[in-house]
């Protein structure tokens, strides 16, 4: 190591596998920002299910080893590259993507992936903005083309993306239905924009949703699906004519009957936030900024972990039951 290099604590992954491959190291060199990059002193970093898929080696995208996970960072800019003009040292920011990984005391990010963090939100909330809210925006407006007056079922609404979807959909004039797996989760979903909420652990909850919609032939216009490998077949039976299921999360295969899409001419659409253009990200950020100013963007924080408990966070985000709010690491 060259003399004068600063060191930091960071989670490093040297091999793909279970949560135990997340290793805390205290001698990781603090990266230096290049021309269009900033170095962020991380105060909080969101934990997302996709990070567990990448860590396991089962995801389509495999980072070069070793690597540091983490995208949803909130913190204070420590330094900027020589071509960065929109940000400066000391600015409070959040981002939806990092160059060097967010499970660390410092993280590099490209200057077109970071946004000012308003003083009205703390760093915990900032770490819950990027991927959850941008994914919700893309799912609702890019993938589903949702419109005011339509109905939307958020299937798995008590997590970070689900609650963000409820808030955004309610603010844009949709009738919002949600599901959760606990009484606490149901209450939280109602507090964050849903008109009605159902317990997806009850055997007859699908029938209750159908009754709520009213006309059995009408159905739900849009379903934002967080666990397609369990719910997609039922989703297709809940849709209205021309209805759309947007798949945000899936942990395995599922058998469906394509005939369920034919009579009502329904669609199944996948969503990938990383497919968004820079212009689309700017649109999402503008929508969030307006929501923050008007008060309907209210990130809900769930479980909090110190950096050294990252492996436990990965275990809990997949196997924990009745998750509510956004899971974060605190630094």
UniProtKB/Swiss-Prot annotation:
UniProt cross-references to Gene3D superfamilies, sorted A to Z: Medium-chain alcohol dehydrogenases, catalytic domain, NAD(P)-binding Rossmann-like Domain
Task: Give its localization.
Answer: Cytoplasm
Assigned EC number: 1.6.5.5
Catalysed reaction equations from the record: 2 a quinone + NADPH + H(+) = 2 a 1,4-benzosemiquinone + NADP(+)
Spell out which residues are annotated as carrying N-acetylalanine.
2
Task: Give all N6-succinyllysine modified positions.
Answer: 298
- The question of whether RNA-binding is a record keyword is answered with yes
A Gene Ontology BP annotation from the UniProt entry: protein homotetramerization
List GO molecular-function terms, semicolon-separated.
identical protein binding; mRNA 3'-UTR binding; NADP binding; NADPH binding; NADPH:quinone reductase activity; zinc ion binding
Binding residue positions for NADP(+) = 53, 158-161, 181, 200, 231, 248-251, 271-273
Q: Which UniProt keywords apply?
A: Acetylation, Cytoplasm, NADP, Oxidoreductase, Phosphoprotein, RNA-binding
Q: Name one GO cellular component term.
A: cytosol
Please give the Pfam families that the UniProt record associates with this protein. ADH_N, ADH_zinc_N
Q: Which residues carry this modification: Phosphoserine?
A: 35
- According to the UniProt record, list the residues that bear N6-acetyllysine: 23, 186
What's the subunit arrangement here?
Answer: Homotetramer.
Its job = Does not have alcohol dehydrogenase activity. Binds NADP and acts through a one-electron transfer process. Orthoquinones, such as 1,2-naphthoquinone or 9,10-phenanthrenequinone, are the best substrates (in vitro). May act in the detoxification of xenobiotics. Interacts with (AU)-rich elements (ARE) in the 3'-UTR of target mRNA species and enhances their stability. NADPH binding interferes with mRNA binding.
Q: Which family does it belong to?
A: Belongs to the zinc-containing alcohol dehydrogenase family. Quinone oxidoreductase subfamily.
Q: What is this protein called?
A: Quinone oxidoreductase
Q: Which organism is it from?
A: Mus musculus
């Amino acid at each position: 190591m060259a003399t004068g290099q600063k060191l930091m604590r960071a989670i490093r992954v040297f091999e793909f596998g279970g949560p135990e491959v997340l290793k805390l190291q205290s001698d990781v060199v603090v990266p230096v920002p290049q021309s269009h990059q900033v170095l962020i002193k991380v105060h909080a970093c969101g934990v997302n299910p996709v990070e567990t898929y990448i860590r396991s080696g089962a995801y389509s995208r495999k980072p070069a080893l070793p690597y540091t996970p983490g995208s949803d960072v909130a913190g204070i800019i420590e330094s900027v590259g020589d071509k960065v003009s929109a940000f400066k040292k000391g600015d409070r920011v959040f981002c939806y993507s990092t160059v060097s990984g967010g499970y660390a005391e410092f993280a590099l990010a490209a200057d077109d992936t970071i946004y000012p963090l308003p003083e009205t939100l703390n760093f915990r909330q900032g770490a819950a903005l990027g991927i959850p809210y941008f994914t919700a925006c893309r799912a609702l407006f890019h993938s589903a083309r949702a419109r005011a007056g339509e109905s939307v079922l958020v299937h798995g609404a008590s997590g970070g993306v689900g609650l963000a979807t409820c808030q955004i959909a309610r603010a844009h004039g949709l009738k919002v239905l949600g599901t959760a797996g606990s009484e606490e989760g149901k209450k939280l979903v109602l507090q964050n924009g849903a008109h009605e909420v159902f317990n997806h652990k009850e055997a007859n909850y699908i029938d209750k949703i159908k009754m709520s919609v009213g006309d059995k032939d009408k159905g739900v216009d849009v379903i934002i699906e967080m666990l397609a490998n369990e719910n997609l077949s039922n989703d297709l039976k809940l849709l209205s004519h021309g209805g759309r299921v947007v798949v945000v999360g899936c942990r395995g295969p599922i058998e469906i009957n394509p005939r369920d899409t034919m009579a009502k001419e329904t669609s199944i659409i996948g969503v990938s936030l990383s497919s968004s253009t820079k212009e689309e990200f700017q649109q999402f950020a503008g929508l969030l900024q307006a929501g923050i100013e008007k008060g309907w963007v209210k990130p809900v924080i769930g479980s909090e972990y110190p950096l050294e408990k990252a492996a436990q966070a990965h275990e809990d985000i997949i196997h924990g039951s009745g998750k509510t709010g956004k899971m974060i690491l605190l630094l």
